[in-house]
C-alpha cells in the first residue's frame, strides 16, 4: 500500500455515477478516472451526485483509478 506521502491529490467533477459506488471523475487537468468512495465517507453516508466537486487521491502506480476523499459543499 502506498504511503501518505506518495499519494497524488487532484480536484475534479463527477461526470457519471457507476454501479457499486464507483464514479467517473473528470480531473482539473482534463483526464478522466474511475474513483470509489473512501471508507469514512461511506461510514458517514456522504452522498455524491453527478456534478459534485470532489478531491481524488491517486497512487503514482495506477493513474486510472482513485479514491474520493472529500466532497465540496
Swiss-Prot record:
Location(s) in or outside the cell: Cytoplasm
S1-like domain location: 1-73
Origin superkingdom: Bacteria
One of the record's GO cellular component terms: cytosol
Record PROSITE patterns: S1_IF1_TYPE (PS50832)
Keywords for the protein's UniProt record, in alphabetical order: Cytoplasm, Initiation factor, Protein biosynthesis, RNA-binding, rRNA-binding
InterPro entries referenced in this protein's UniProt entry, alphabetically: NA-bd_OB-fold, RNA-binding_domain_S1_IF1, S1_domain, TIF_IF1
GO molecular function, one term: rRNA binding
Pfam families per the UniProt record, alphabetical: eIF-1a (PF01176)
Subunit structure: Component of the 30S ribosomal translation pre-initiation complex which assembles on the 30S ribosome in the order IF-2 and IF-3, IF-1 and N-formylmethionyl-tRNA(fMet); mRNA recruitment can occur at any time during PIC assembly.
Protein family: Belongs to the IF-1 family.
Free-text function comment from the UniProt entry: One of the essential components for the initiation of protein synthesis. Stabilizes the binding of IF-2 and IF-3 on the 30S subunit to which N-formylmethionyl-tRNA(fMet) subsequently binds. Helps modulate mRNA selection, yielding the 30S pre-initiation complex (PIC). Upon addition of the 50S ribosomal subunit IF-1, IF-2 and IF-3 are released leaving the mature 70S translation initiation complex.
HAMAP family: IF_1
UniProt protein name: Translation initiation factor IF-1
Provenance organism: Acinetobacter baumannii (strain ATCC 17978 / DSM 105126 / CIP 53.77 / LMG 1025 / NCDC KC755 / 5377)
Amino acid at each position: 500500500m502506498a504511503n501518505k506521502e506518495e499519494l497524488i491529490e487532484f480536484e475534479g467533477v463527477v461526470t457519471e455515477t457507476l454501479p457499486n459506488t464507483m464514479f467517473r471523475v473528470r480531473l482539473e487537468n482534463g483526464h478522466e478516472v474511475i474513483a470509489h468512495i473512501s471508507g469514512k465517507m461511506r461510514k458517514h453516508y456522504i452522498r455524491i451526485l453527478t456534478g459534485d466537486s470532489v478531491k481524488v487521491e491517486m497512487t503514482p502506480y495506477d493513474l486510472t483509478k482513485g479514491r474520493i476523499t472529500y466532497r465540496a459543499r
